[in-house]
Amino acid sequence: MKTIAPGIQQWSFFSQEKQLNFNGLLLTVNDHCILVDPPPMETADRTAILKGYAVDYILLTNRDHVREAEACRRDFLAKVYAPEADAPLMELPVDKTYKDGELLPGGLWVIHLKDMKSPGESALFLDMGKGYLIVGDALIGRQAGQLNLLPAEKFADVNKAKASLTRLLKYNFDAILVGDGTSILADAKEAVRRAIES
C-alpha cells in the first residue's frame, strides 16, 4: 500500500490483459474509512486493513469497477455504494446508489459524466486543502504524467464524452487518482485539459 497523502492510500494490481495497473484507494477522511474501486489486494494489505481500520463504505465509480467489492464487503462488513444509473447493470447487489451532485460519506462530491462507456460513470471530488479528483474509466493513465480516454470504440460518440469531461475543469484539483494506470499528483488539471483537447 502506497501513501499518496495523509488519509489517502493506494494499492495496485497489474492487469496482464490491459497491461496497466488497476488501482484501489483506502481513504480515511472525516471520520470515515472508505475503499474506492477495490482491485485484488495482497494478503498483507488485507490483513493490515482488517487490523487497523473499520471500513464503512466501498464506493464504485462505474459498473465495470466492481472488481473485489463483494469480497471486501464480506471481509470488512462494509456497505457498497454505486452510481444510480449503473447499479441495475451490476451483478453485485448494492446497498445504496448515488447520483450527480450528491455529497457522500467522507466528504466526496459526485460528478456524473454523461456519454461515457457506462451510463453511470462518475468522478469523485475530495477537498482536503488540496483538491483530489478520483476517476474510474473516465480517464486512464497509460503513461506517467499523461491522461487518455478509453479507445473511441468504447463510446457511442467520443466527442460527447470529451464534452462531458469538461465538467471536471470546474473543480479546484491538483491531483487526479485514476482507477487504471498511473495517477498524477501535481498539475493534473492541465493533463485533463490536454486529454480533452487531444
What are these model-derived regions, one by one?
Residues 19-21, 92, 98, 118:
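Residues that act as N-cap/strand-start positions at coil-to-secondary-structure junctions
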Residues 1-31, 169, 190-193:
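Zn-dependent metallo-beta-lactamase
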Residues 95-105:
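Short acidic-hydrophobic, aromatic-tinged amphipathic segments that line or gate anion-handling sites
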Residues 15-16, 32-35, 41, 53, ...:
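Metallo-beta-lactamase
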Residues 72-75, 87-94:
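Short loop/helix-cap segments at secondary-structure boundaries that form the rim of catalytic
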Residues 42-82, 175:
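Active-site metal-binding motif and surrounding structural segment of the metallo-beta-lactamase
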Residues 84-88, 139:
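Short, acidic/turn-prone active-site loops that include or flank metal/cofactor-
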